[in-house]
C-alpha cells in the first residue's frame, strides 16, 4: 500500500527546521543542488513534484530546475533567503551523480556576468546547472 505524501504547507515549524538543517548539512558537507532538495523531500515523503520551472528573473529561458510544485519552490526559496545563499553555476556532473539531469541544452559557462548578460537573449529554454553557496563564498 502506497503511503500518502505530506503537503509541504502542512509541515510544522519543527519539521521545516529539520528539513532546513538537512539541506544545510548537505550543502556544508557535500555541496547542495536542486537534485539534493528533491532527494531530501522524497526521503521525507513530501509532495514536491509538479510542472513548474525554477528560472531566474533575468530570462525565463534560463532554467535552474524543473518539475517542482509551487510549495516546493517556496520552501527552497525560503531556505535560500534565510540562509544567505546564492546560486553558483556548476557542471552537470553534480546532478548526474545525484540521479537526474534536465533534458535541455546546457549552459556550460561558469562566467556569471556573461551568463546574466546573455540570459534575456535565449530563445529556447536552456539549463543552467547551479549549486547553492553562501553569498560570501567566493569559490
Go through the PLM ranges and name each one:
Residues 39, 52, 101-104:
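Intrinsically disordered, low-complexity regulatory/linker segments
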